[in-house]
Amino acid sequence: MQTSPLLESLMEALRCLPGVGPKSAQRMAFHLLQRDRSGGMRLAQALTRAMSEIGHCRDCRTFTEQEVCTICTNARRRENGQICVVESPADIHAIEQTGQYSGRYFVLMGHLSPLDGIGPQDIGLDRLEVRLSQEAVSEVILATNPTVEGEATANYIAEMCAAHGVLASRIAHGVPVGGELEMVDGTTLSHSLAGRHPVTR
């Protein structure tokens, strides 16, 4: 069946989103055109503004419309002395929702992957090293993902921190709250046993 070139273009554009295949893209496109054109216009305007106006923070590399993000300009957070290293801006959002961290961040926008040609400078580690040498950093919290690449990246950064006399710590990995022990994979269980702590009363 021959369809509108514009409709085909819309469906193809929607497929750039993660997890969206041909059928999902078709369903979204028809929904916007048939039932929610005003929502489609708002989406188009928001996307256009976001793509043109959102850049990266000069200090931590997260997404922001300003040269420096609000977290990095917060005096209380600057005095904290902690930098939490994460792989993506989405990780910052997740950590902020816990309300348990009051320092600043550094976003790698990925992880080390020599097989893919991704080295230290590709994920901004040269800029992190500048911060370690110029700022009063007391601790770097390594919150990269618990993958082979994430662990390799964390180890590399830990060595950088040691060279600058800065404490490096790794976030704990283990059994999820509400999970059943028999369903947990061996690697996670190993991390849990290695990272056990005394029970306090």
Curated annotation (Swiss-Prot):
GO molecular function, one term: DNA binding
Residues in C4-type zinc fingers: 57-72
Gene3D superfamilies, per database record: 3.40.1360.10, 6.10.250.240, RecR Domain 1 (1.10.8.420)
Annotated disulfide bonds: none
SUPFAM superfamilies, per database record: Recombination protein RecR (SSF111304)
Biological process terms in GO annotation: DNA recombination; DNA repair
Domain of life (superkingdom): Bacteria
CDD domains: TOPRIM_recR
SMART domains to which the protein is assigned, alphabetical: TOPRIM
Domain Toprim: residue ranges: 81-176
Keywords: DNA damage, DNA recombination, DNA repair, Metal-binding, Zinc, Zinc-finger
InterPro entries according to UniProt: DNA_Rcmb_RecR, Rcmb_RecR, Rcmb_RecR_Znf, TOPRIM_dom, TOPRIM_RecR
Position of the signal peptide: none
PANTHER family: RECOMBINATION PROTEIN RECR
Function noted in UniProt: May play a role in DNA repair. It seems to be involved in an RecBC-independent recombinational process of DNA repair. It may act with RecF and RecO.
Record-stated family: Belongs to the RecR family.
Name of the protein in its database record: Recombination protein RecR
Species annotation: Edwardsiella ictaluri (strain 93-146)
